[in-house]
Amino acid sequence: MAYIQLEPINEGFLSKISDLLLCRWTCRNCCQKCYECSCCQSSEDEVEILGPFPAQTPPWLVSNRSEDKEGDSDNTTSEPPATPQDTSPDRRRSSSDTSRSTYSLTRRISSLESRRPSSPLIDIKPIEFGALGAKKEIVQPTVLRKSYTPEDYFRKFEPRLYSLDSSNDDVDSLTDDEILTKYQLGMLHFSTQYDLLHNYLNVRVIEARDLPPPISYDGSRQDMAHSNPYVKICLLPDQKNSKQTGVKRKTQNPVFEERYTFEIQFLEAQRRTLLLTIVDFDKFSRHCVIGKVAMPLNEVDLVKGGHWWKAIIPSSQNEVELGELLLSLNYLPSAGRLNVDIIRAKQLLQTDMSQGSDPFVKIQLVHGLKLAKTKKTSCMRGTIDPFYNESFSFKVPQEELENVSLVFTVYGHNMKTSNDFIGRIVIGQYASGSPESNHWRRMLNSNRTAVEQWHSLRSRAECDRVSPASLEVT
């Protein structure tokens, strides 16, 4: 038998009606109290209680339950008091049966209440942390909130602020005529074409027009009306494997007509940027950058090729590269010999406007801070990419090896005046840089094996600043 749960009213006349008809446990068939109607008299197992159960037991069940418990403790069955209206045996028997049914129902409700699920409401209390004897700190639990990222968050990032050449970023939005009017550095004419058969990129430097006159650093205007320009060509980001045109003397409209070839795969060439740097070689053997032209090769048809006139824009590079030198070092502990091979150099600065350069290399052994030995290679005529393949040997005991330095200086031969300085590096105890120190360390760990390495030449002032051995040589 099923029972429905209703809310009683605790005041006035309606309280009496609810006590009879709207009590918490009312028979669904006759709407009487469950312990008074005859249709509800059944065994404990046949009673079906529908929940959820109230938090408190009805007052009329509490009173009856207490009476039943007292009677049960005395092992006697208590009977409800007889009503003055009817004291017949049938009425007393009915009341006794009702009392037993009530006690069964009360016991069932009590057992179910003990298993009643807890309330879904969660009472959040502060969490206390702290060591024994220390001041307690109350930490309130916080509500996790989803982070919000504005839509224009990444738009605020400005890559030009992190660019090495951020001053020229606005040039991309200008036309060639606007660039020419703004900077007045002239125009450069060149062409490109890719050879699919041989995997070569051919670059032809044709001419330049309206180059600016050179700037006088000493205030004199003698021989400063015209420039002595030349062009350096490379494929970014690789600036080491560069090419260089000859110097055109005293002209603002030089005609070069020189072709250069870069061995590179087609897909790799499309990822490169062709950089042409226009440089002025003045009478004081100074190399001043006039400007540059940069063209991404993925923006043009390399196979078809083409000719372009491009406006020259300013360059952040104030000094040009001095060139590179390929060396090989080897030490034989048993013989106490330090062997040096001068293999080749490339892209050396020109020291003569008409003939290019006549470069040679001077090798000087410095023991501590004292010059011990000097040797030099032969002079290569009219080239900026000389091949030497010359070997030199120095007597250095093993216990003194850590106290020696090798100074390599590249000069351009000059028959009229003193030789022209091109570049220098120092290897050994007083190295001029980390690449030089790395080469020396690799040689010491090579176990008699020759170690080759390319080195970028440095200026005399830079070497003198970081290497005491550079100050001891001429």
Curated annotation (Swiss-Prot):
Provide the topology term for how it sits in the membrane.
Answer: Peripheral membrane protein
GO CC annotations? membrane
Biological process terms in GO annotation: cell differentiation
The record's InterPro entries line, in alphabetical order, gives:
C2_dom, C2_domain_sf, Synaptotagmin, Synaptotagmin-15/17_C2A, Syt17_C2B
Pfam name, any one: C2
**Protein's cellular compartments:** Membrane
Protein name (Swiss-Prot/TrEMBL): Synaptotagmin-17
